[in-house]
Amino acid sequence: MAKIKVAIFTGNYNHIRDGVSLTLNRLVAFLLKNNVEVLIFAPTIDDPALEHMGTLIAVPSKKLPGRPEYRISTGFPEKQRRILEEFNPDIVHIATPDILGYKALKWAQKAEKPIVSSFHTHFSSYLKYYNIGFLEPILWKYLRWFYNHCEQVYVPSQSMADILKEHYIETDLKIWARGIDTELFHPSKRDESWRMKMGLRESDIVITYVSRLVWEKNPDLFADVVKRLQTKFKQVKALIVGDGPALSGLKEIFPEAVYTGFLKGEELAASYANSDIFFFPSDTETFGNVTLEAMASGLPCVVADATGSKSLVEHHKNGFLIPVERKDEFYNSLKTLIMDTDLRENMGASSLEKSKQYTWSAINSRLLEFYKEVLSK
């Protein structure tokens, strides 16, 4: 097969460091290494959060209302359209069904180019946090129309695929999971001096939350449950890793926690390895990158029984899956792990073993094969 040319359209490629931007940059790096030409179209800012991979073409955008750190495209002007036409992609990959994604879909239809899409954000689960849940039927109607015009849709987990099927998205759904660097994230990164630096003793039982700090990911639920545990177990400490708009509010309701701010690389790996339990009650994930990082670091995981983490955590094997509304069950599961050192270690070992199934090379190789499958039709 001749060299493949892929045009990728996304709402975030480098202006915010999150699971979407990191996943897409890893994909582009893999594609370039495997002799695939790639052109990316996305909103940009003057001071991006990460150094992007590949050739990025900026599109007009404005701040997203209510979430000004994110940007939303406002269109696909003639200048960018000419660049796309000159590139003449073999396949159009749309990562966000926003205005830019809609324009890309319409262009690809007119140009008779195959269209694929990847599902990164569980949009409908966010509506309740903004008190606009009444818009959910309209949103699903649009998503159904959008994805049913794609030849393939790549979802990060089977649980997410099941949800799309429930909403009558009938296109070819493929599992494109997320990978992990098992050399970076590993129990061997545990170091008592790191704990000391954070004001934590080796005898402490550290319960950790890692995420971009936004209320949609339920950091307040984490705070409520761990504060309750601390009234019973004096050795329990809370470690909160990340930054975001909810940080100041979280510090107000949970000043006792240790806050590291944003971490990456070896420091992020150390934060997991120096923890004892990972507690992540977010129910808005499509995959659960942080859960996988915790697993690779050998931690038992107490997570919300929702899309994303439920594809990674086996209840009573490497952690506990709890319906997000059952706060007492989160408390009791964490209490069990605090009191039972052997269970904590056994579940952590199971997490470590399961994480070995997820390597970026194998996962992105699978996506490249999906591209080739579409192009062979």
Which positions does each model-derived feature cover?
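Donor nucleotide-sugar binding/catalytic pocket of nucleotide-sugar-dependent glycosyltransferases
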Residues: A42, A58-P60, W140-R190
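Conserved donor-binding/catalytic core segment of Leloir-type glycosyltransferases
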Residues: L200-K217, F222-K227
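Aromatic "clamp/platform" in nucleotide-sugar-dependent glycosyltransferases that forms part
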Residues: K264, D283
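Short hydrophobic beta-strand element within catalytic cores of glycosyltransferases
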Residues: P300-V303, V313
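A short, well-ordered alpha-helix in the C-terminal region of glycosyltransferases
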Residues: E329, T336, L343-Q357, E369
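Short alpha-helical donor nucleotide-sugar binding micro-motif in glycosyltransferases
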Residues: L84, F262-L263, A270-S275
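Conserved acidic donor-binding segment of nucleotide-sugar-dependent glycosyltransferases
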Residues: H315-H316, F320-K327, T336-D342
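N-terminal subdomain of nucleotide-sugar transferases
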Residues: M1-A58, W360-A362, L368
